[in-house]
Amino acid sequence: MTINDSVISEQGMCEEEQVARIAWFYYHDGLTQSEISDRLGLTRLKVSRLLEKGHQSGIIRVQINSRFEGCLEYETQLRRQFSLQHVRVIPGLADADVGGRLGIGAAHMLMSLLQPQQMLAIGFGEATMNTLQRLSGFISSQQIRLVTLSGGVGSYMTGIGQLNAACSVNIIPAPLRASSADIARTLKNENCVKDVLLAAQAADVAIVGIGAVSQQDDATIIRSGYISQGEQLMIGRKGAVGDILGYFFDAKGDVVTDIKIHNELIGLPLSALKTIPVRVGVAGGENKAEAIAAAMKGGYINALVTDQDTAAAILRS
């Protein structure tokens, strides 16, 4: 019996990856077939058949003989080391569009997490917009409500613009960064802004990107014009390694104090983000490893979608 590696399932996995994951959960983690079917969104009969197919094809022997084994090992280590609820590590492929593949992986994770009519809070950035573009049909069919976590309407349009016009989207009607702390306070006190921020904090699931100070000019927050290169240099000198929603934190995951932009941001602060039950971080690139690790240490995310090389770098850091 041969494995069909060309067909991609509704869960975004080829058959070999499904077999590898089922085998790992069954033999390594000790899950029952019923528990595995719930986790992967498959019928119990499908799980049983794929286990048998794994044995007959040679994937399942004394060890899991699959190119996905490394990803599964990284997922287990990340889950244990950082107390994560959910992890998806995608295998590395030469010359592949990592951002697009992360978006696919994050989209399938969200499809397994969100129930009909629940609310999804979204942060700005390429990773989250890549995810949103691949969720449009699911969002429409399941009547998922969307709410933005920060101001800056333009930053969200590449994702929101792909959605059905009937989709419920609550956007903060303000810039991401005001020109002064006083103006930011005034805007956040406006009911139209305050109501969206309250809705965002009440979301069932959140998805955010993670920026790294080490990215320098490649960082979304710089390319979008929200901070200057000089500001980024100053922020780095204060010990910051990464940011979520424009809020910078150090290697321990603590928000760095005395940073001007923090008082000028219009969005959900990280302390409020942590009250959302499931917080998915989607980010890749070895230069982001320290920032991703810090975000997990700070508890800003409790679920992660990343690539194999980045996962290895995180575990080495």
Curated annotation (Swiss-Prot):
Q: Which InterPro entries match?
A: NagB/RpiA_transferase-like, SorC_transcr_regulators, Sugar-bd_dom_put, WH-like_DNA-bd_sf
Q: Which organism is it from?
A: Escherichia coli O157:H7
Protein family per UniProt: Belongs to the SorC transcriptional regulatory family.
Q: Does the keyword Transcription regulation apply?
A: yes
Q: Cross-referenced PANTHER family, in alphabetical order?
A: TRANSCRIPTIONAL REGULATOR LSRR (PTHR34294:SF1), TRANSCRIPTIONAL REGULATOR-RELATED (PTHR34294)
User: Which taxonomic lineage is given here?
Assistant: Bacteria, Pseudomonadati, Pseudomonadota, Gammaproteobacteria, Enterobacterales
Q: Which UniProt keywords apply?
A: Cytoplasm, DNA-binding, Repressor, Transcription, Transcription regulation
Tell me the first and last residues of the signal peptide.
none
A GO cellular component term found in this entry reads: cytoplasm
Mind telling me what this protein is named?
Transcriptional regulator LsrR
Q: DNA-binding region(s): which residue ranges?
A: 33-56
**Its Gene Ontology molecular function terms?**
carbohydrate binding; DNA binding
**Where, per UniProt, does this protein localize?**
Cytoplasm
Q: How is its activity regulated?
A: Inactivated by phosphorylated autoinducer-2 (phospho-AI-2). Phospho-AI-2 acts by binding to LsrR, which is then unable to bind to the promoter regions, allowing the transcription of the target genes.
Q: Provide the function of this protein.
A: Transcriptional regulator that represses the expression of the lsr operon in the absence of the quorum-sensing signaling molecule autoinducer 2 (AI-2). It also represses the expression of the lsrRK operon. Acts by binding directly to the lsrA and lsrR promoter regions. In the presence of phosphorylated autoinducer-2 (phospho-AI-2), LsrR is inactivated, leading to the transcription of the genes.
- Name the domain of life: Bacteria
